[in-house]
């Protein structure tokens, strides 16, 4: 089922797939508003990389 046909479903998928932060030290996924990593407590976080096609 292609999701590209329905913009609402596409927005939901994009939010869940790309709106989070990655810890640069341990690689854990964190919520988008995180300041510290949930696993190693590092403050070295980056947003998830996203490429548009």
UniProtKB/Swiss-Prot annotation:
- Tell me the Gene Ontology biological-process terms attached to this UniProt entry: translation
List GO molecular-function terms, semicolon-separated: structural constituent of ribosome
Keyword annotations from UniProtKB, A to Z = Ribonucleoprotein, Ribosomal protein
> Which Gene3D superfamilies is this protein grouped with?
4.10.1060.50
Would you tell me the Gene Ontology cellular component terms?
ribonucleoprotein complex; ribosome
Q: Which Pfam families match?
A: Ribosomal_L40e
Entries under PANTHER family matching the protein: 50S RIBOSOMAL PROTEIN L40E, LARGE RIBOSOMAL SUBUNIT PROTEIN EL40
Stated family: Belongs to the eukaryotic ribosomal protein eL40 family.
* Name under which the protein is recorded: Large ribosomal subunit protein eL40
């Amino acid at each position: 089922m292609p999701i590209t046909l329905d913009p609402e479903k596409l927005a939901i998928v994009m939010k869940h797939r790309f709106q989070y932060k990655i810890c640069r030290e341990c690689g854990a996924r964190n919520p988008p508003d995180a300041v510290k990593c949930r696993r190693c407590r590092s403050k070295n976080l980056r947003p998830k990389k996203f490429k548009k096609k």
